[in-house]
């Protein structure tokens, strides 16, 4: 028996003001799009904006439903839109921001497990890692070079083929 471990590095910026202009603009767009999220139950609004390899932007927001399991996270809304409107176009960078109407929104929040799996398969399908920018409405920003770092033992299409 042997023990193994996973480790990954990510960058921490104290403010979006410290980011390169391109990343700062993407974070600001993600923060802005939280305004149109539909989150009447949790009041936890999430916005995501992706920069495609073509230079185009795609956005998504969380969409809650009174039947809680039916809701949709911002990341999956974004990826479904990108996949539909820009089939097989890789995503360079995805910025995700949240606005907690009931409290602070200054610490970056990570994606949920379902979204990690969804993003992982999108990376696999387009054969390109997706950079992630994670933030609240202000405060620190986390930058990950590839979203796959968040799901080191991912399940993918190869697992279905035996």
Walk through the language-model features, giving the residues of each.
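Short acidic-glycine loop/turn motifs at beta-strand connectors
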Residues: 52-56, 136-138
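C-terminal binding/interaction regions
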Residues: 1-36, 80, 86-162
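Short beta-strand scaffold segments in enzyme catalytic cores
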Residues: 45-52
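Short loop/turn motifs at secondary-structure junctions and domain boundaries
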Residues: 39-42
């Amino acid at each position: 028996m042997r023990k193994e471990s996973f480790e990954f590095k990510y960058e921490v910026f104290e403010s979006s003001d410290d980011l390169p202009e391109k990343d700062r603009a993407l974070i600001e767009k993600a923060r802005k799009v939280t305004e149109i999220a539909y989150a009447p139950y949790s009041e936890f609004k999430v916005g995501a904006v992706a920069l495609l390899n073509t230079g185009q932007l795609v956005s998504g927001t969380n969409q809650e439903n009174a039947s809680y399991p039916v809701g949709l996270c911002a990341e999956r809304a974004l990826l479904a839109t990108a996949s539909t409107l820009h089939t097989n176009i890789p995503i360079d960078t995805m910025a995700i921001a949240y606005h907690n109407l009931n409290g602070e929104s200054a610490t970056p929040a990570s994606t949920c497990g379902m979204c990690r799996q969804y993003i992982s398969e999108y990376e696999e399908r387009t054969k390109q890692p997706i950079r992630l920018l994670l933030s609240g409405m202000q405060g620190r920003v986390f930058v990950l070079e590839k979203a796959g770092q968040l799901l080191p033992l991912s399940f993918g299409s190869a697992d279905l083929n035996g």
